[in-house]
Regions:
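Catalytic domains of riboflavin
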Residues: 1-413
């Protein structure tokens, strides 16, 4: 054996702890893949560009600058292990299947234990816990007898037991470039230049293939037995939802986001209570990843335009302000489902062809698409829904509405 290699407790080789660990993305084991190290305690150990915590990495830098956080703080990972087992799945060992997250990111305390003992500052990029969620829409569904209290998944007063996991982005740059049909050098240059030169290593260190971008990640919510996720046998109901703070949290009625989120949760619960499993994936992509400032500017433009807020101009107003109608890049969205070992969705709560097509391109089958029920659409969101239906969004058996005659509420109403 090479003198620079050590062995873990099970005999798997690991590198000398005086070296920068090599990363072999898609390797068959964690030991062969190696840990992702983007911490700064020892720059010689870094094998990735960027730093941990996604969009919160800048707050960490501010905390260190303000001397409220020690720059050499070492995380105590005692009792932080996942509360439920996820993986490993075959997709973890395919460098083309998962390119935007670290599939071993929730298991660093286990699979990289020897690295931690020898002073490598390896951090989790995924955390898995349990929780109860409580939403008025769930209680309304119980009152309408679409969901029942079972004492297991749903309590008598309407709270729902879930397994949830938070996932920070970890990008394997060659895989990201391939997913978008780009040259890796062009991708690196674009990321470097269009962030104002924020990450010079993107262009100066082509040997570093992994990048931890300062963007939001995703949270998954699993309803029912999470051990059944990815078993290939258990029926799965799924909603992939992109963040909309105004609607999801505050109930703004200009869009259908919260209604569809609630509907996705409802069908996930129904599937779990029928012996299957339910899943909601919540991606931090506010305003179609254009951001909330841009979204509110578009709202103003829609409401102030001559003739009022109309479906015919719904996408055009976004393009006028942002230059593009959507930057969510659903090409990366299937990765979280690959992480969970999912190969088939039996009921998919989505009207978006972009989401559906992205999953199909990645080999994830969809048996049934479930549109948002018409009675869940807020009045002012009719503009959005008519525009999307005209653009080809899936509607199921719903008849077309009054596209030409639909006008949204005025700005000052």
């Amino acid at each position: 054996m090479n003198a620079n290699l050590l062995s873990t407790a099970n005999g798997s080789p690991i590198q000398s702890m005086t070296e920068r660990p090599q990363l072999v993305w898609g390797a068959p084991t964690a030991a062969e893949r190696g840990p992702v190290i983007a911490t700064l305690r020892n720059p010689d150990h870094r094998n990735a560009v960027g730093s941990h915590a996604g969009g919160y990495s800048v707050y960490r830098a501010l905390a260190i600058a303000a001397r409220t956080l020690a720059h050499d703080h070492i995380a105590d990972l005692t009792d932080t292990a996942p509360v439920e087992q996820i993986g490993p799945h075959p997709q973890w060992c395919d460098a083309r299947k998962i390119v935007s997250l670290d599939p071993w990111g929730h298991l660093v305390g286990e699979v990289f234990r020897e690295h931690l003992k020898r002073g490598y500052d390896v951090r989790p990029t995924i955390a898995v816990t349990r929780a109860h969620i409580d939403m008025p829409e769930i209680r309304a569904a119980m009152a309408a007898r679409r969901i029942r209290a079972d004492g297991d998944i749903v309590s008598a007063h309407g709270s729902v037991r879930v397994m949830k996991a938070a996932i920070d982005p970890v990008w394997y740059l060659p895989g990201i470039a391939e997913r978008f049909g780009l040259d890796e050098t062009d991708l690196r240059r674009g990321l470097h230049e269009q962030t104002g030169g924020m990450y010079p290593e993107l262009v100066s260190r082509p040997d570093l293939k992994v990048f931890l971008p300062p963007i939001g990640g995703a949270t998954i919510y699993c309803f029912g037995d999470s051990a059944k996720l990815g078993d290939g046998l258990t029926p799965l109901a799924c909603r992939v939802h992109d963040e909309c703070n105004g609607s999801d949290v505050f109930g703004s009625d200009i869009c259908t986001c919260r209604p569809y989120l609630a509907h996705g949760i409802e069908i996930a619960i129904q599937m779990a209570q029928a012996g299957g499993v339910g899943l909601v994936v919540y991606n931090r992509k506010e305003g179609r990843a254009l951001g909330e400032v841009t979204k509110f500017l578009v709202y103003n433009a829609r409401k102030r335009q001559k003739g009022g807020d109309r479906p015919a101009d719904y996408f055009a107003r976004t393009e006028c302000v942002a230059g593009v109608r959507d930057m969510r890049f659903q090409e990366l969205m299937p990765d979280v489902l690959h992480w969970l070992g999912i190969t088939r969705i039996h009921r998919f709560a989505s009207m978006s062809d972009m989401k559906c097509d992205a999953l199909l391109r990645q080999g994830i089958a969809i048996d049934e698409r479930v549109p948002l029920p018409d009675d869940m659409i807020p009045p002012d969101a009719r503009v959005e829904i008519e525009a999307k239906l005209a653009a080809g969004y899936f509607a199921g058996e719903r008849p077309r509405g009054d596209y030409a005659g639909t006008v949204g509420r005025g700005l000052h109403e």
